[in-house]
């Protein structure tokens, strides 16, 4: 169909009606609803992940822990990161379009995860008292210890996936800092995360997604896991 002349204002309603008629003829696929009974949650834990400190800058330096950084192409050097929308760092990257990724190595201690994973940058200064940091060429912070390399990213595309945003970025700087192996999620749970006390009676709640322990008899209905950001529905009593 071609419109061969300019559209008059009194013809707009006719065009709307035509557009709606065409839309009605198009087949739309119903959303796929998967049977949750066929999905064993523990199977997802067999996927391998690294652990990273993602840093960005707004009114102040900020960072958070993420576990999803992937190289997409080698030429140009391009990566993707997935960030939970509940994280303050997420909003900073949306606004600025730049970030740094510090790749954590096996020297990273639990205090580092507490600093960047168990508090919000909206209320706390996560870099306060932390000396093992420096600024890259983009002006953002990166770790100089407990990290074997860092990458700087410039966002070229954002993809909305409900609870998370995937940022596609070109790498603008990258540097190797240490030779220690990169930390994986499995290494974190086996060697870094403190083991809960062996008590015979229930004393708290465990996040089924990441294993975080909430100590207390009752879990608030609006509780959000400080590590993986999942809600109370993903906790079970221990």
Predicted regions and their residues:
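FMN-binding flavodoxin-like domain, especially the glycine-rich phosphate-binding loop
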Residues: 1-32
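Short, exposed beta-strand "edge-strand" segments with a Pro/Gly-rich flavor and a Y/T-containing core
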Residues: 1-7, 208-211, 226-229
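Short, structured secondary-structure boundary patches
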Residues: 16-23, 123-126, 237
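Basic, polyanion-binding surface patches
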Residues: 28-209, 214-216, 224, 233-234
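Short Cys/His-rich micro-motifs in 6-15 aa windows
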Residues: 228-238
